[in-house]
Amino acid sequence: MASTVMSSLSLKPTFTLEKTSVKGLPSLARSSSSFKVVASGVKKLKTDKPYGINGSMALRDGVDASGRKPKGKGVYQYVDKYGANVDGYSPIYNTDEWSPSGDVYVGGTTGLAIWAVTLVGILAGGALLVYNTSALAQ
């Protein structure tokens, strides 16, 4: 009797899942469409001269520090190809973008008060955390 029961059992699972679609629910099945990533073009900076300190080479007697005449083969030969920032000097501000009223804080007194209250709150919160985790709180 045990042998007939064992022979009727299959060792391989025969679990099958039928695909059913429910109206209004999105399908979780993967589509066979291909995924392609395309990089955008290089953004060139348009400025009159490169940002770095050596944007224009003004050498005494027409020679560099080692006594050689420049051939124009430095990084600045690529200014027209890659844009002005070819020397790796990347300022966080540009004098052309400065505010004309840069000597006055735009936020005014209210902005300074909000900034001060935020700073005091952060410092007080840190002090409270230190106090609560120390032996003084017990």
Curated annotation (Swiss-Prot):
Q: What is this protein called?
A: Photosystem II 10 kDa polypeptide, chloroplastic
**Pfam families recorded:** PsbR
Q: Where is the transit peptide?
A: 1-39
Q: What induces it?
A: By light.
Gene Ontology cellular-component annotations: chloroplast thylakoid membrane; photosystem II oxygen evolving complex
Identify the taxonomic lineage of the organism of origin: Eukaryota, Viridiplantae, Streptophyta, Embryophyta, Tracheophyta
Question: What this chain does, per the record?
Answer: Associated with the oxygen-evolving complex of photosystem II.
Would you kindly state one Gene Ontology biological process term found in this protein's UniProt entry? photosynthesis
**Family assignment?**
Belongs to the psbR family.
Name the keywords, alphabetized.
Chloroplast, Membrane, Photosynthesis, Photosystem II, Plastid, Thylakoid, Transit peptide
Indicate whether Transit peptide appears among the record's keywords.
Answer: yes
Task: Identify the main location.
Answer: plastid
Where is this gene product found?
Plastid, Chloroplast thylakoid membrane
